[in-house]
Amino acid sequence: MDTNWLYVLLQKSTADPLERLKLGNVILNEVSQRKVSPHPKLVNDFLDVMSGWLTGSNFKVSTIGLEILDAALRTSPDVLASYYFDRCSVLIERMGDAKVQVREMAINLCLQLAYLENSSPVMLLDRLCVPGTGFQHKQWLVKVGSLNILREFLSSSFALVIQQAITLIPQLCRLTNDPNSEVRDVSTQCLIDLMVYGGKPIVAKIAATRLINEQKMATLLQRYQTTVATRGDLPPKHTITMETTPAQPSRNSLLRRSLRSPAKIIHPSASTTSFTSSARLSTPPRPTTTAAQSLSLAPQTPSPLSLPSPSGGQMSRSRDLTRSSLRAPAGISISRYRSSSCAPAAQCAITLDDFKKSFTAVPKTTIYSNHDIREKLELANLVLRNANEDWSKRANQLKLIRSIIINCDENIDRSLLISIINELADALEFSIRDLRSQIVREAAVTCSFLFETFGMEVKNVAECVLPAALAQVAVSTKVIASSAATLTVFIVQKIQTRQIFTTLSELSSSKAKEQRRQLAVVLETLIASWDLKSKQPILKQIAQLVQNAICDADGETRVAGRKAFAKLEQLHGTTADLIFRELDPAKQKMLRDGVSSSSSSLNSDRDNNNQKQQPNQQNISQKFLSQRSASAVDKSIQLSVKPQTTAIPSRPTAMPMNNRLPKSSTSTSFSAVRSSGYGQNQSTTPNRAKTPSDGFAGSSPHYTNGNNNNKSSSSSPSTSTHQTPIQRVASNLGSSSFVASLTQEQANCLQNAMNTAKDEMSKNNEDDEFLLDEIRKTPPKEVPRSYNNSPFKPSNLDSSVHRSYNNNSPFRPSSGSVGSGSNGSVQSIEHILKACTSSSLNEKRDAIVNLNQVITDPNLCQLECKNIGDTLSRLLAEGNNTLIISILDTISIFIKFQYKKLDNWLKLALGKLFAKMGADALPNVKSALSSTQKMFLTTFDPTFQLKAVCDFMCDPVHLLSPKSRLALLEYICLLFEEIWPEDPRCLERQTHLDTPYTRAAIRKMFAWMFDPRIGAILMPACERLVCALFALNAADFTMIFGELPSECRDWAYRILQLNGQQNNQKPIEKEKERFISNNNYKPCPLDNEEIEKPIMKTTYSTYESTRKEYSQTERIATENQYSTPPPPDYRTSTAHLAKNHVDQAAYIRNQLDAIRDFEKADKLNEAMANLHGMMCEGSFTLWNQFFDELLDSIYQILSTFSQSIRKKLALRILQKMCTAQATKLFDSTEIAISKVLQCACTSDDNTMGVAAEDCLRILASHLPLTRVVLISRRILSQDDDDQRGVLILKMLTRMFQDIDIEELHLIVNDVAPCFVTAYESMSSTVRKCAVFGLVALVQRVGMQRMEPHLRTLNASKLNLIDLYVGRAKSSESGASSN
């Protein structure tokens, strides 16, 4: 065994998380390709190591450990299955992990374990039913995971788990009353599933338990009836016998399933989220092939899923709880088949041609009578419904169904045959859901043959099997997926019912990209094959589904969506226009490019222009497609083709097109702008020569002889091309009654006006012209004289819209516009802002460069500043890492020059900045963000900044990530703490802070801080903010915090006390000494620069007036005169040590060495402060290496009698250790509580009791409840020390308010007598604490539960308890009403 590869790797396992990650990747790679040795000691060692990884606190280590266990189970199921069941409790505990990914991976691994060949869901349910685990676990997430597993078993293996499910009915009923809402919802849904699958006997049994009140039971029955009536994906009806009968198979036979029948567990219809590539559980894992293999081996007519996913063969599976909660993964990496001859290829995919060939590839069957047909089809129905039947027999029965239909003669009653076929719906749906690929393929072929033969007569079968087929599309087995995909195409082609469309529309929100892709494919089929009567009521829903497919995250789904859009546009142009209008410009461009490339071959033979006469067309098109800037186009080419003003439609269609204006040109609908190509580069399109009737009679003699052979897109190619001038113009303008009523002169004038407008728009040569939401208004050009007398002359033709500039401004453009492109062309602000939203990266980069020149203009108006600010905010939120530094620099320049006009923009800009600062970024990006933040701080009025930040903080619309919230809080701290010494524009001392927005922000801060998910991240910033707020204005601080809840006030008081912030003002020297001795958080200035803080702070108004009068030298001298250098022993930040484990270990070792030296109290206190600072900053990560040693040192410090050692700091370190690594303190619970009590009782410091109370509260809430209660009872019963008793009573009282009600009921009988005994104490302090504890118990568990323990008290003491309980209830009701 010493030479085994796994044994060698396991010997390298350490406690270092980084080393575990590296080792885990090596083990995962090996265990995915090699089997694990069956040696018992090796397997036990392997699982012990993995269990240690799972129980650790590192998220990535837990994830890699679960991946290793999954890969090992897939490669060596026969070796590891029994060992996994022995350690199933570890997986159950991981179902309650804080990370969603870990929870899902643990659940999927449990499901995979249940579906092994020699395993069963019954065995896993046995583990989940153990008291204290699974359904009875104290962690609500574990309960939810267990319930989801039960729902999976109910939907997939109902016959196996029915007896256990019936036993669990009382437990499920109790869970519907769980304190957690999510547990209640899942348990309710589980009961509904059980009722749906089990029928009326289960409903009666649930009602007979009487554990659910009448109202809830009525709701359950209503939801049960609704589900039965509406759901189309229910499993076959099961006949359930409540009592075990001799006909039932024994449980051992269910646990030991036959290897020859791998399809006994019927999987659910919906797919689930999996962390590996998923496959069917009963068949060997079969990875998909690469794209090259698929293209070379696939048949000529591939099915919609015959090509592999671009993700390299690993198809993600999504969890759809409305159909089936969870799905066990059994996929495997393609590396298993690198050297194997059994590797599957793309030729396994099933195509439409394969289906049609298989229709008649069946053995011949002789049919004698109608009775003979009924007998044979009923036999087939029974065989197909039996999951225990051999798969070959089931496949033969599916072929028999096709053979019966093929060999029927005219004497057979057709109505009888169709009725019997409809009775096969459940059996066929059962076969479609099967795990055996041969069964799924034959079932899909049989169903397709039925739809092809009978059509709408078997619509019930189609509606039944469609959900199962769509669910099978997402599996990784190519035969199953492609068979199901082809079946869906047949269903949509032949069955046109509303139920079919409803089932399809449910896939729009599926998490499986394969299902969404197949939805887009069948949408194209639906649009093309369904008649108008069936499509008209659901046309809007079809359009919405097509739009969702176009905007999908998957590339292949978007391609299929664009094809569906082309078909929709061809048949329903108005609906396509509505979709096109709602799409963003990038999607519109994709539609134009994709459809034009697909329809170019159709238009090439109908184009009158010679391709050779336009040598630059192809080159310019390539520049456009490669996102080159339009300014690179040669202007000489542009001038040479300028008279040719006809443009191609910006969204081509699959129909033949001509080169004139479309018929809808005069319409005000969006299709006119979309199809007429406003602003299109004319040199890139095929053009026709203009005739004199087009309005260019006097422009050039070269164009007087036009080509008269052009055909209209509305006319047939066989019709005559001769048209009169008015007919030609009218055909260009459209065929509406308005155009028909025009005279020849009026029509010519209208056509000339439209041509002139297009000429003006084509001068800018933009790539992204489709982004313009309105026609740019340009100076008028000379128009034909006949147009001046026309009644159709637009009123705004002679007006030009340009921003007015000051003639003395150095930034004034020569032509009313600013900015210049790469070719020297002048650009307007509107043009630059439009270019900033371009999808072209080069275009956007050029626009940002031009914008830097524009924003320095002091004459920008308020509206222009608003538009520029909105554009910069959008650019900052896009997350483009390539341009982010340029964008931040532009924002800094914009603020510097235009900050007086940006009051309304400040709130939005700060929000985008905080969101960006909360995201992971490179060091250079972080530096740029810091510089931009500094520009905000040093430019805007600090009071206005505070209001903007507080308003944004309380705005419920904006949701920030935890790191973004941290950035926001630190920004407020910077406003308070005067962090920028070279520009002291921050809040003055005694600034009025008692405002509504400040109060709301403080309440919001506490809501964030008390959130258990993010409170640890925000705690240091909240402490810093409270101290800074108190230092800025103590009076307003008192007013604000006076209206907050008591726990918030107590917390703030403790923070101020710990940080040395007292109400009385002492001399500066003493204040600094006390601040240094008591402060555990000392902010480090940015970039580690020493900052000199002036005692006499310069106000904002004074600074504005003196900044212009005094030179920099005088100001620096003034600051130096009134400045005091910072204390030299401020603790530096250790955040950089979080990822540098080598330096972190050395630093911690030095501090621990200093802590052991009790003779040097100063160094010991400094070392404790440094370690506590590391824990506050999150840079202490080597817990496994130093936890035991640090805990021993803390215990020694708490036991010493030296008064020079800061024991309060040791208590805070113990709190941090318990919060971060509570499990490591489980075994020393009694020691920890005893040490804290000893420290509090032997100290002369009056404030030590407060610190001890906080520490005891943390220990009681994190350590095992039974041990805490046991030591508390021992201390209260044996110790006569009143101080220790008071601390224990306060600890228990706090614990009563924090723990769950079920846990409290378990310990009431143990702790209530102790409080009653303490109520009889001689000490008034002990009696007071006992009363508060009894009141807390009565509030939580009720007077009826406490009455047996309170009988020994006299009437006066009971009245006192009733009085306090009444006051507590009244205060709670008053707080809730407010």
Swiss-Prot record:
Superkingdom classification of source: Eukaryota
Gene3D superfamilies: Leucine-rich Repeat Variant
Coiled-coil portions: 740-767
Compositional bias (Basic and acidic residues): 775-784
Pfam families: CLASP_N, HEAT
Main location: cytoplasm
Low complexity bias (residue ranges): 269-283, 610-619, 664-676, 704-721
Polar residues: bias regions: 620-630, 637-648, 677-690, 786-812
Stored SUPFAM superfamilies: ARM repeat
One Gene Ontology term of the molecular function aspect: microtubule binding
Thylakoid recorded as keyword: no
Functional summary from the UniProt entry: Microtubule plus-end tracking protein that promotes the stabilization of dynamic microtubules. Operates redundantly with cls-2 and cls-3 in regulating microtubule processes which position the spindle during asymmetric cell division.
Family that this chain belongs to: Belongs to the CLASP family.
Protein name: Protein CLASP-1
Organism from which the protein derives: Caenorhabditis elegans
Gene symbol of the encoding locus: cls-1
